[in-house]
Curated annotation (Swiss-Prot):
It holds the Pfam family PrmA. One of its GO terms (cellular component) is cytoplasm. Belongs to the methyltransferase superfamily. PrmA family. The keyword Signal does not apply. The gene is prmA. This is Ribosomal protein L11 methyltransferase. GO terms for molecular function: protein-lysine N-methyltransferase activity. NCBIfam families: prmA. It catalyses: L-lysyl-[protein] + 3 S-adenosyl-L-methionine = N(6),N(6),N(6)-trimethyl-L-lysyl-[protein] + 3 S-adenosyl-L-homocysteine + 3 H(+). It comes from the Bacteria. S-adenosyl-L-methionine binds at T158, G179, D201, N244. It is found in: Cytoplasm. The lineage of its organism: Bacteria, Bacillati, Bacillota, Bacilli, Lactobacillales. Keywords: Cytoplasm, Methyltransferase, S-adenosyl-L-methionine, Transferase. Its EC number is 2.1.1.-.
């Protein structure tokens, strides 16, 4: 029987996606996220009984490594990278790292138990790929395999990106998804009526994972996934460009985004911590965009910009 090594990192909720990425980069074969907010949000939804869970801003991210992995080296690297994230201004909280060994079937049971279907927006619900789910009339279901470690789509930055897509897509658009990760924003765009979606990620693992998640969802063969460094070398114009990545990276793509977004089109930027907000706004305004919508959840911000000559109801530019 193959055995696995489990490493659990306790961090602030705002660091969920960044820390998950760190764990995958150190060789984890999957992650599971335990968040008290998920339990509290589910409580009383259908009258089920849930254990009492104390609300906390700290979450537990558990990563699974093959038995051959040198955990001492992995944990040292994790601690170094978490310290670096904190130096960038990301709130990571008081970090603790635990580890243990477990059998393969225990891993399969452990990481799946954390995930439940989650209604994210008015129309969109994210459902784990192994779950049978009966959608209501008009409900659009995104199937994801969270075991692939790019998150379940419930992080505030992803939620706000999905809200923004729901706000701007009317059907028939061309969408570019920069830093696609799990592919959730591309899948949502397809379900919301976009005609063609181009999804790019610098990470080859993300490209593979995104394609696997896309394949789980029917009617998404209009999504084209490829490796790419932001928007470098892209010539395809788009009605909507969406990027849910760190603010320091977002500012590197705004000029290219302005070049590619069609007139009256939109640029959706998410993944912005509050202290980086002004930097992103100034960069987008300098590129020529006008701000149409500003969303906030906790320390995270998402912005919807428009490329337009009609500046009524918009800000900046």
């Amino acid at each position: 029987m193959e055995t696995w090594q489990e490493v659990t990192v306790h961090v602030h909720r705002d660091a969920q996606e960044a820390v998950s990425h760190v764990l995958i980069e150190t060789g984890s074969q999957g992650v599971a996220i335990a968040d008290s907010a998920d339990y509290i949000g589910q409580k009383d939804r259908f009258g089920e009984l849930y254990p009492d869970v104390e609300q906390s801003d700290m979450i537990a991210i558990t990563a699974y490594y093959p038995s051959s992995t040198n955990l001492a080296d992995v944990i040292a690297t994790i601690n170094e990278q978490l310290a670096e994230l904190a130096s960038f201004g990301l709130q990571v909280g008081q970090v603790t790292v635990d580890s243990q060994e477990l059998a393969e079937e225990d891993w399969a049971d452990n990481w799946k138990k954390y995930y439940e279907p989650a209604r994210i927006t008015h129309d969109l619900t994210i459902v784990p790929s192994w779950t049978d789910y009966d959608a209501s009339a008009g409900e659009k279901v995104i199937k994801l395999d969270p075991g692939m470690a790019f998150g379940t789509g419930t992080h505030p930055t992803t939620k706000m990106s999905l809200f923004a897509l729901e706000q701007v897509l009317r059907g028939g658009e061309t969408v570019i998804d920069v830093g696609t990760g799990s592919g959730v924003l591309s899948i949502a765009s397809s379900l919301l009526g976009a005609k063609t979606i181009y999804a790019y990620d610098l990470d080859d693992v993300a490209v593979r994972v995104a394609q696997e998640n896309i394949d789980l969802n029917q009617g998404t063969d209009n999504i084209h996934v490829a490796a790419g460094d932001l928007l470098k070398g892209v010539s395809q114009e788009a009605d909507v460009i969406v990027a849910n990545i760190l603010a320091d990276i977002l500012v590197l793509l705004t000029d290219d985004a302005y070049r590619l977004v069609k007139k009256e089109g939109y640029l959706i930027l998410s993944g912005i911590i509050s202290e980086k907000l002004d930097m992103v706004l100034e960069t987008a305004f300098s590129a020529g965009f006008f701000l149409e919508t500003h969303m906030v959840q906790g320390e995270w911000n998402a912005l919807v910009f428009k490329k337009t000559d009609d500046i009524s109801g918009v800000i900046g530019g």
